[in-house]
Amino acid sequence: LLNAGHEVVIVDDYSNSCPESIKRVEEITGKKVVSYEADVKDKEAMQKIFAENHIDCVIHFAGLKAVGESTRLPAKYYRNNIDTTLTLIECMKEAGVTKIVFSSTVYGDQKPPYNETMHKGDCTNPYGWTKSMMEQILTDCAQADPELTVILLRYFNPIGAHESGKIGEDPQGIPNNLMPYVSQVAAGVREQLTIFGGDYPTPDGTCRRDYIHVVD
């Protein structure tokens, strides 16, 4: 976005990231990034951020995303992920912001290949259900408000880092995705990588995944 000439405002509570990543983005692009340390569920904080900046469009990435943790702590996931969306859409309405892009992933265990028109399918974990519910909230809001434009992006597994090597996926604690886990094993931070599952319909019985590089 910065390289395309857009001004960027970042809101992050740094629960699974660090401010250093923003500094490195500024180094790579040579441009200043406006950033706030805040919880998107905090409506007062979000109202202040919208008031202090001219926002044309919101890209909504805020949310917890660990599938395994969501099965152990479902209420935490429903509270966090849905509340962030409700707070965000309310603050957008108050500020007159009419465009939002939402990061989603809700196809469940449907048979591939996937396409944009297929039924979302039943989700297999609380994390997936929160994404499905957030999609429905945004869809209903768009239907109720003809001025609101909502784009739902259903990603498969994003992976990789910037070609400079200065920014990439470096989560706090135990990684939930494959590449940072592999990287930590290679760096000696963790002893081994365990591959789960041995009865998938593949030549060796292990699971297959498709990935998209973050720069692409």
What would you call each of these model-derived segments?
Residues L1-A161:
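N-terminal Rossmann-like NAD(P)+-binding domain of SDR-like oxidoreductases, especially those catalyzing
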Residues T139-D216:
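NAD(P)-dependent short-chain dehydrogenase/reductase
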